[in-house]
């Protein structure tokens, strides 16, 4: 009995870093490591950036907790992480005065405490500095088996969803067209 009790903390410690594991492209998918010669700004509305969510976690009726997550800031951080391999420079909109491309992001999440699964939906809309919309993509992601480290699991789920939108931007050719326009200027 004591042996079984001691193994759980060891397993939790071993799998704690799994939430930060990046998603690898499947067969036929384009790799995100492109480093196109673009300066990309990630933009969010002030309301979305200020979003805080309240989640309830219950571990088999033995442990209950309520947790506030600054989800707006987490969404922006995940978008910056996911889009970084695509281009030379990625910064929040307010930190980049003259971007070549602006991507406005939005994300929403739902946590199922009984199944311990995070569900995430994201939208990424690309704009030229002139304000012209060039493309908009949506993606979803989920991660299950979340017993601890909920915020890291939520962030990795957002990163996976934004990586999917990044693949859609690449596959549509939108980023390549903007990079060619920028290099010809």
Name these PLM-found stretches.
Residues 18-76, 174-185:
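A structural "domain/chain start" motif
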Residues 1-2, 93-98, 182-185:
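Extended alpha-helical regions
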Residues 19-27, 86-152:
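Surface-exposed short loop/turn segments
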Residues 60-68, 130-179:
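Short secondary-structure boundary motifs at beta->alpha junctions and helix caps
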Residues 72, 76-80, 84, 121, ...:
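Extracytoplasmic/secreted envelope proteins and their assembly/folding machinery
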Residues 1-18:
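Sec-dependent bacterial lipoprotein signal peptides
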Residues 9, 17, 124-126, 166:
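Small side chains
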């Amino acid at each position: 009995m004591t042996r079984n009790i001691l193994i759980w903390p060891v397993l939790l410690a071993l799998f704690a870093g799994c939430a930060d594991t990046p998603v690898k492209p499947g067969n036929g998918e384009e790799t995100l490591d492109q480093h196109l010669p673009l300066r990309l700004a990630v933009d969010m509305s002030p309301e979305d950036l200020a979003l805080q969510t309240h989640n309830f976690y219950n571990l088999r009726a033995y442990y209950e907790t309520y947790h506030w997550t600054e989800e707006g800031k987490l969404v922006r951080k995940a978008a910056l992480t996911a889009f970084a391999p695509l281009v030379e420079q990625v910064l929040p909109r307010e930190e980049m005065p003259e971007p070549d491309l602006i991507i406005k992001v939005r994300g929403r999440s739902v946590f199922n405490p009984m199944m311990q699964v995070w569900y995430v939906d994201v939208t990424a809309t690309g704009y030229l500095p002139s304000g012209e919309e060039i493309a908009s993509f949506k993606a979803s992601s989920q991660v299950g088996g979340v017993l601890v480290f909920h915020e890291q699991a939520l962030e990795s789920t957002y990163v996976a969803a934004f990586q999917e939108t990044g693949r859609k931007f690449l596959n549509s050719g939108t980023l390549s067209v903007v990079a060619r326009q920028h290099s010809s200027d």
